[in-house]
Amino acid sequence: MTADKDKDKDKEKDRDRDRDREREKRDKARESENSRPRRSCTLEGGAKNYAESDHSEDEDNDNNSATAEESTKKNKKKPPKKKSRYERTDTGEITSYITEDDVVYRPGDCVYIESRRPNTPYFICSIQDFKLVHNSQACCRSPTPALCDPPACSLPVASQPPQHLSEAGRGPVGSKRDHLLMNVKWYYRQSEVPDSVYQHLVQDRHNENDSGRELVITDPVIKNRELFISDYVDTYHAAALRGKCNISHFSDIFAAREFKARVDSFFYILGYNPETRRLNSTQGEIRVGPSHQAKLPDLQPFPSPDGDTVTQHEELVWMPGVNDCDLLMYLRAARSMAAFAGMCDGGSTEDGCVAASRDDTTLNALNTLHESGYDAGKALQRLVKKPVPKLIEKCWTEDEVKRFVKGLRQYGKNFFRIRKELLPNKETGELITFYYYWKKTPEAASSRAHRRHRRQAVFRRIKTRTASTPVNTPSRPPSSEFLDLSSASEDDFDSEDSEQELKGYACRHCFTTTSKDWHHGGRENILLCTDCRIHFKKYGELPPIEKPVDPPPFMFKPVKEEDDGLSGKHSMRTRRSRGSMSTLRSGRKKQPASPDGRTSPINEDIRSSGRNSPSAASTSSNDSKAETVKKSAKKVKEEASSPLKSNKRQREKVASDTEEADRTSSKKTKTQEISRPNSPSEGEGESSDSRSVNDEGSSDPKDIDQDNRSTSPSIPSPQDNESDSDSSAQQQMLQAQPPALQAPTGVTPAPSSAPPGTPQLPTPGPTPSATAVPPQGSPTASQAPNQPQAPTAPVPHTHIQQAPALHPQRPPSPHPPPHPSPHPPLQPLTGSAGQPSAPSHAQPPLHGQGPPGPHSLQAGPLLQHPGPPQPFGLPPQASQGQAPLGTSPAAAYPHTSLQLPASQSALQSQQPPREQPLPPAPLAMPHIKPPPTTPIPQLPAPQAHKHPPHLSGPSPFSMNANLPPPPALKPLSSLSTHHPPSAHPPPLQLMPQSQPLPSSPAQPPGLTQSQNLPPPPASHPPTGLHQVAPQPPFAQHPFVPGGPPPITPPTCPSTSTPPAGPGTSAQPPCSGAAASGGSIAGGSSCPLPTVQIKEEALDDAEEPESPPPPPRSPSPEPTVVDTPSHASQSARFYKHLDRGYNSCARTDLYFMPLAGSKLAKKREEAIEKAKREAEQKAREEREREKEKEKEREREREREREAERAAKASSSAHEGRLSDPQLSGPGHMRPSFEPPPTTIAAVPPYIGPDTPALRTLSEYARPHVMSPTNRNHPFYMPLNPTDPLLAYHMPGLYNVDPTIRERELREREIREREIRERELRERMKPGFEVKPPELDPLHPAANPMEHFARHSALTIPPTAGPHPFASFHPGLNPLERERLALAGPQLRPEMSYPDRLAAERIHAERMASLTSDPLARLQMFNVTPHHHQHSHIHSHLHLHQQDPLHQGSAGPVHPLVDPLTAGPHLARFPYPPGTLPNPLLGQPPHEHEMLRHPVFGTPYPRDLPGAIPPPMSAAHQLQAMHAQSAELQRLAMEQQWLHGHPHMHGGHLPSQEDYYSRLKKEGDKQL
């Protein structure tokens, strides 16, 4: 046993020795590493322990010293340098820390702390104190102040578990394992505060700014210097220090005007609490403590002139002269009384103690003492009666408490609102008092108002604490988040050559090629020089560039996303990152934040990929270093190629999206979104259109790095949202896209070197990177000259803008974020592709094909025309659009071929608005492959160059992304081909099929119908083909660079592809084999089906990715197999068609549920239900038919009756009904039908009926009085006897009867039945008429409505004008319009004379029927002899003037039968008295009397306008007799035609009595 023990001891010693040796080696290695440049970190990691990165403090301090200057010499041995050290007092307190650069840090200093992520700036804090953490032995115990070497920092900053300490402690005293820590108090940058909080602050500041001067924060530089102080303290390594800064405090934003943005200077005004996520001043926190209390001097009142003391009106509540001892005794007595009372109430001694110890009890006792004049005896006697004041909770009922809590939840601590809405019986002060009581109760814990906005802060922190760490809330990432600092250049400096390789680098911001070192940094993780990076780290923004320099020749155009630090992307993004930034500090491990700090889960995969440099997202040093170190040529190439791989997946993905229409549109936004480096894209980005040429390349995103380095020319493909978990794919896409791609549209900053107006064609370098540039001699180069003003050198990156996908920011929602720049965000291809604001005067050359070859990269750049935004935000093509047809049609015909998958835009519209308004520079690609589902028909190339004349609007592709998604498209037939000059023509494929585009006169008509289009001449292969024309891998989607879209033959099956966005053109999907893979290049293209746009919801779910198929030739013809291919418990899949290795889930497989399965039952039920519904519908249909048949029969019967009556009666009163009724609101009785609804007299709008459109159509209709509405012939004078005719004529001659007729017919049918029934009843002998009451309040419907419905109205040709015809007194304006609109609809097919004749005949019939007095009386069962009796009766009473006048309301007109005004036989025919008579509502106006046929001339038709001379008494009697008959006839007519029960309420008893009396009189013998 002892031997074993000895062996074990020996082994342990050996292990210890080995450990010591390794330690020494590591120390040496660290010292040698000190000479290396600082390594930047590309990790996404959250809060990881600093110590895990195993960096020594020396290294950290060395690498980033006070000013963060990194050492520049690589691998050169240096003389040993000074080490960092610290000073201690004799008490052991560390007073200062001195770095190797002699920067001295002391407690109280404000400093930068390394954030360890290249895309986040340094953290800023103030040092509270230093402490040394080591094992039991102290580093230095000397009693005198001493300088000590600080320990190495490989132990946790504040969070390593204890066992590390014990391991580390084995070293000697002062061992490197000891470490120097510091407690720091954080300042938060504006970008680290949650966006919502900061936005509220900005809003408040602007609202409160009444000074008339701009706030200091309008200057972006100063805005970025504002910090928010916090009380949160963390412990960090001294090694994380990166320099000192100065922080000033200002009392408010106005005082901050004095701040000068000097180097390393910041200011703060407010505090920020990361726990509650609130700013101190904005949300009303309670501030207690000396720092928040005002220091008030003692009051020194002015002597008042009138001798009153200033305190006269104040209430004295306490006099301080009481003896303390007496006071204490009194209070004890009071409390003991309260305790006794409490014990009695509660039943336990605890209750008594609680009652005694309450503040309320003490307060009550003191108040009572004061009120008792400081007589303790009296006070105690009073207290006996009420020793304990009523508790606050007892003053509130349960219901009030509930309402209070509800109010708190609803309105927060807005007590005024709570009182107003819920507790009006309480005072606001009571609410506040109760709140402070309530908030301490247990139920308050779940109801506190602010918790709604809080996250559980405690659990956010992942730090484990060591015993030495103070228990304070960490709010920054534990210092050890620093982790691996691998950088692009980490290992490359190991060799001497690496120094030379550095010369190939250039800063992507300032373009300098000289720098101490190169690291990725900035919000976009681009390659930066030391100065730019340090500036970003300190101030959170890249430095402004005062004198832009040209990018070095070897860079195409730098992938520069940051224009100036101020206006670049990040300036808009910084706030977006706020939420997650603050969490960074608090160590919360949210998702790794994206470069802009966002942490939404969606971002997660892009997050890593969102950087723009090849290595940005790779965590391992290998990836990153390998890429950036490549020679510049390779580098450029990589940039071009990196996006390729990720595209592959998308490409196929789209192919699998069979719901091409909506889906494509939904994808669109997605692709776009990713094309912003940090856009939160959905997990699967699906690019809808780009196909990269490198099909054979590996599609695994992990291979992209290698592929990028490969030398084969690769093309940048539009960035498809490939969201593979390995994010490097995207990152590369974005970052590596040749700068050309990044051609910043107005929003993405363009290389500052590019003067805005000049196209910046990057000079193609010797490297293969000039991927898309066809050799100048190549056939395509010949096309370029066609474009006027286009730079002749083909633009290297002929990138087609990935149509909508590139509308980088098509507003996802109808409220598009405004684009900061004047130009449409897209313009990717602008002639200069790089012009930041390409004014669109230079037409981008049509990039032609390169020599055909498997990778002819030049394949199809379609032109994008940038331009200043047009009224719609569409960039006008200033020069292009207006290019005369003569100028190279191709040039002005921007994109006919590039059909974007409609889907993309649709998606955009449904995506929630993204938080980053900045579109990343659109990536463009030479080949954009339209998604397989929406092939673009190919046209022969020669035609492709025809310039359609009406394409003069900017191409839809360059459409401004700001446009909200277009409303659902109506069927194409309704699209007009005439576009206002400023609007885009609809995407070509959307033109109404019936109109061949004028642009291609040469196009043979049969072209579009033929299935085999002649293949385009080899010299201009259609740009859409990805490879040589004969075998394009995806030929089914060729694009034609500029051909007019084929007119789709009507014979093709119409497929529906909704074009979903301004930028998308719907392409008819090819059907059959062509869609699934047939090569069109070979010459066959599927007949283009008519494009029908299906209006579908835009929110189809996205299809999952499908693996990219290998590039291939057309699939074999399908063979029918019908074999089961897969079975599950409930269903079986059958393979219907076999296409070899290619298959289409939609057409080749079908799915059969097994009998008895739930699915089968569901389907059976659905079929049953459908059958039942169909039967029900059929039954209803049959019933409706029967009803219609009956109605037709009734109508025929009625017409026969009317004819018989017309023959029987005389036609003497021909135009009776066209004579006006008495005027006045009461006289115009409602017609027998309810007034027709207002129906447009304009051709109906065929399309979705919406209230808004309906309202607009009403507004658009000419007014009734408008001369344009005068539809009747002008030579036809209006009948002077009918004041309404003026209003009625326009409706009378309207010739679009369809809608109105249908409605009128239906209503007539319904009402005719009712009328008929009543009429039959009335015609029965012995039926006693009880006419419905006349409605005195009804607004007098048009007396001619009857004729309006029967399309007949006599228009006497001879009548002269009447002064009152145009403004009838009894008609309100709405009624006039209604009458005009409801006018009779004459059948359009009748000629004008026929129409007049028909009107006249019909009027005669109706008049003869309705004006026959006998017929009328019979209708009411009033016999003729009674009629006679009534006349005699009237004669008998002729002279009883006085009694007759008693009931009349006013004098009688001389021409009116005096009896008509009198009570007895008013003959209108209503009983006497003040009956509210609708026929005589007011005494008629004189003019009306003269105009009325009864009181005017006997034959107004023959003697227009003449008033007869005074008549003799006999004549007068005769006239009265006639009038009586006439009036009775009129009344009867009114009753018959207009008195309808459903229009009026109950009967007027007076009418009823009158008619029954009339009938009884008729039954008497005369």
UniProtKB/Swiss-Prot annotation:
> Domain of life here?
Eukaryota
**What segments bear the compositional bias annotation Low complexity?**
479-488, 609-623, 726-751, 778-796, 843-865, 897-913, 970-980, 1053-1085
Q: Which residue ranges are recorded for the region named Disordered?
A: 1-90, 464-495, 542-1133, 1162-1246
Q: Where in the cell is it found?
A: Nucleus
Q: Where are the zinc fingers (GATA-type)?
A: 507-532
Q: Write down which residues bear the modification named Phosphothreonine.
A: T120, T1119
Q: Which CDD domains does the record associate with it?
A: BAH_MTA, SANT_MTA3_like, ZnF_GATA
Q: Return the SUPFAM superfamilies for the record.
A: Glucocorticoid receptor-like (DNA-binding domain) (SSF57716), Homeodomain-like (SSF46689)
Query: Which InterPro entries does its entry note?
Result: Atrophin-like, BAH_dom, BAH_sf, ELM2_dom, Homeodomain-like_sf, SANT/Myb, SANT_dom, Znf_GATA
What cellular component terms from Gene Ontology apply here?
histone deacetylase complex; nuclear body; nucleoplasm; nucleus
Keyword NADP present in the record's keywords: the answer is no
Under the subunit heading, UniProt states: Interacts with HDAC1. Interacts with ATN1. Interaction with ATN1 is improved when the poly-Gln region of ATN1 is extended. Interacts with FAT1.
Instruction: Please name the disease the record associates with this protein.
Output: A chromosomal aberration involving RERE is found in the neuroblastoma cell line NGP. Translocation t(1;15)(p36.2;q24). Neurodevelopmental disorder with or without anomalies of the brain, eye, or heart: An autosomal dominant syndrome characterized by developmental delay, intellectual disability, brain anomalies, and neurological abnormalities including seizures, hypotonia, and behavioral problems such as autism spectrum disorders. Brain anomalies include abnormalities and/or thinning of the corpus callosum, diminished white matter volume, abnormal cerebellar vermis, and ventriculomegaly. Congenital defects of the eye, heart and genitourinary system are present in half of the patients.
Task: Give the protein name, as stated in the record.
Answer: Arginine-glutamic acid dipeptide repeats protein
Q: What is the scientific name of the source organism? A: Homo sapiens
Originating gene: RERE
